[in-house]
Structure formats: structure tokens, C-alpha cells
């Protein structure tokens, strides 16, 4: 059987030994993130890649695709959705580092870092009372999306004394059935949130929040879910952190809300168009911290990814359910 790795990452000798122990005789082929439509997939059984070929008729032996991302919005409208070929994501590998990023972002907003850091630029001692930080203890954070990332955000932010609310597609499903590469983390039993909300309850959920963390995948249901009408429900002192995908908060709406003071501040790590280079209105928007989709980029990712790959390979060969299998119906 042949496994094709089409990414910037490479298998170490230890990685190869791990995979070959699961599947003796497995042929491992490495490419450097090549254009997948130009590849010869006629003899490929397993594909590890961020790109998924559309010309599936030329990949007649393809049995399974493993993505390197936690999300799968790149499959929207893709021909593979009309097949029985399973696609799995890297969900569960990013929880701790992305939650660290969210904790860092929350602290930066609470301590007014976009304004405080101007001190070095102006070289003038500021009015410190005007830049006073806000203690997190007793504040409320609303987490939209309560998968592996949202649950670890809840665990870390609760340690600061924040009251946690969560909003998810099915608030009755409180246990986490997904993969978690970080034992002892997250909220597997769903015990942290003080309140659970469904999508139809945004009008009850948002007014309670001092911070809103967006972790939901990009789907037709989540696209534009936080528009002007929804942001207007927040306190004017509220802050927004978006780490999943662009477009869930329409970019012109977010920029206008920050410029008008409807929203106190935001941290954005994902955009409709990536890579995002200027000109773009975000680059001149006040009280906005921008990062280039870095929250899930961390040292050690590839080792965790290969562990997941080996486990899913074992499951595939034994007929067990694959971890993180994408639902083509739900889009994630």
C-alpha cells in the first residue's frame, strides 16, 4: 500500500518506523506541497495533504485523506463530498497552543496592550490611569464552538477566574467524543460552562459577554453569523477574539464596529483571503491586533500529527471508526 505525504513536513526515521510497524510494507512517498491536481495518484491508497484532488477519477485507489488542519472548509463544494472516501482532520492536536494564544490575546486586551505599546513609539510617558487594565476575575467569556479548542480555552480562561459560557450547534451534547492529543486538558465532561446555548440563543448569549472567543468552523451556517446586529448586542466594553476562520464575522462590519466604538477591541488571526497582504482596511483599524493565522502554528505539531496519523492508519486497517472523520453533511 502507498501513502503519499504532500506537505512541507517530512517523516523522520522514527516516524517511518512507527507507520511501518502499523502497516508492514507500507510505501511512504514524500512531496513538497506540490499542486495536487498535477500529481500521479493512480497508485496512492492514502493521502496526507492540505489539498485534496478534484480529479478523483484519476485516484482510483484512494481510500482515505488525512488533512493537517483542524478545519475542513476547503472541502466546501468539493467532489469528494459526493463519495464515500473518508476525510479526517487534525482536530485535537491544536487545543493547547491555540488556547494559549487565546489566553494571551485575552490578557493583552484586558491590559490595553494595543494602546500601552504606543509608549515605545511616542517616547512620551502616558496617562496611566487612562490605560488601566481590567482584572479578568469575575468577567464573562463566551466561547462560540465547544470542540477540543473551545474546551481547552474554557479550562485555561476559567483558571483566571472568568465565568465561562458556551454556544454550540447542539448544547445538549456536552461530552467531548473527539480526539485529544493533550491528556488532562480540555473539558471532556462539559463541566466548566456556567451556561449552555444554541445558535438560536445568540440574543441571550452575547449581552452577557465581556469577551467572545470564536472557534467554530466555517460552514454555510456560521458564515456571517456575527454581523452588525449581533455585535450591537454586546457591551461597548466587550472584546472579540477570532481564531477559526475568516468570514464568520464579516470583515467590513468588524472594522466599522471598532472604528465607531461599538466594540472595544479585537484580536483576529484568520481572514477571508489568506495570505492577507495590504492594502486592507484592517491594517488601519484602531484597537485591532492582527496575527497571520499563527495561533495553531507551534513547535512539536508534526510529532503529534504523526501519532494521529498512525492511530488512524491502524483504525483503517482494522475496520475501526476513524478519528476526526469529516461529516460531508455538516461540513466539518
Regions found by a protein language model. Name each.
Residues 51, 69, 214-216, 244, ...:
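Glycine-rich, N-terminal phosphate-binding loop of Rossmann-like dinucleotide-binding domains
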Residues 1-44, 165, 169, 175, ...:
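N-terminal glycine-/charge-rich "phosphate-binding" loop or analogous flexible N-terminal tail
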Residues 171-281:
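Rossmann-like adenosine-cofactor binding region
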Residues 84, 137-140, 237:
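Phosphate-coordination loops involved in phosphoryl transfer and adenosine-cofactor binding
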Residues 42-121, 130-134:
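Phosphate/diphosphate ligand-binding glycine-rich loop within oxidoreductases
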Residues 237-332:
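Rossmann-like dinucleotide-binding domain for NAD(H)/NADP(H)
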Residues 117-152, 198:
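Glycine-rich NAD(P)-binding loop of Rossmann-like domains
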